[in-house]
Every structure is written in structure tokens, then in C-alpha cells.
């Protein structure tokens, strides 16, 4: 198994992004990416870029493998706000999937405000989508 390589010396920093070189191959080394498949891959890549908050600095998409140079920002102090989380979820999920999460977050916030729960309620909802 290959060893992970760090491209930035500040990998453990809480205020600077980390940069990774990623490579993934198609199963059985088949030539799976034609013109349409490459365009579909680009679309999904950009969707997940918006969802994750990461930034694709560069990429090379070939017929049977992909290289990405990915910038991963540090997690915001205190994590994402509820609004920021819902905005990211809307980048990859249809409205019908995001509405129940918004409702669950609102209910958790109400319980916290009423003194019937702790911040852990909302944190657990956030961690389902933002765990690193």
C-alpha cells in the first residue's frame, strides 16, 4: 500500500489549507471515460467541490484514471452554521432531501432554546455530513 504524501508542510495547521494529490483508477483499468462520461465526472466533481468546501486546484481526467490537486481548507472555528450546512447540502441533494434535515435542525435548536437539550443535538446532525 502506498504511503500518503503531504504536499504542504503545515498539514496540522488549523488556519491554513492542506493540499493533496489524489489519483483514482477505473476498475480493471478499463477505458471507461469517453467524452460524455468525462463531462458527467466534471459536473459531479464541481458539485462535490461546492458541498465539501474543498477546491480543485487542478485536475487531469484521462480515459481510465484521474489526478486531482485538492485544497482542503481548515474547518471553521465552531464548525459550519446551520445555514452554511444547508447551503452545502443543496449543492448535491434535491430539496426533498434537504427539507427534513432543515426541520430536524430547527427542532434541535428549539429544544436547546427550551432547555430540553444540549448543543450536542445539533452537533450530531452536523457531523453526519461534515465528519472529517
Model-derived features: where do they sit?
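Short catalytic/metal-binding and nucleic-acid-binding patches
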Residues: 1-132
Amino acid at each position: 500500500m502506498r504511503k500518503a504524501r503531504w504536499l504542504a508542510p503545515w498539514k496540522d495547521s488549523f488556519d491554513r489549507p492542506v493540499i493533496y494529490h489524489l489519483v483514482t483508477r477505473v476498475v480493471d483499468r478499463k477505458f471507461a471515460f469517453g467524452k460524455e462520461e468525462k463531462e458527467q465526472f466534471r459536473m459531479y466533481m464541481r458539485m462535490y467541490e461546492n458541498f465539501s468546501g474543498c477546491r480543485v486546484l487542478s485536475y487531469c481526467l484521462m480515459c481510465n484514471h484521474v489526478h486531482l490537486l485538492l485544497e482542503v481548507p481548515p474547518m471553521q472555528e465552531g464548525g459550519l452554521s446551520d445555514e452554511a450546512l444547508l447551503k452545502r447540502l443543496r449543492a448535491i441533494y434535491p430539496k426533498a432531501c434537504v427539507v427534513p434535515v432543515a426541520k430536524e435542525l430547527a427542532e434541535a435548536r428549539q429544544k436547546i432554546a427550551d432547555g430540553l437539550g444540549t448543543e450536542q443535538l445539533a452537533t450530531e446532525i452536523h457531523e453526519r455530513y461534515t465528519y472529517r
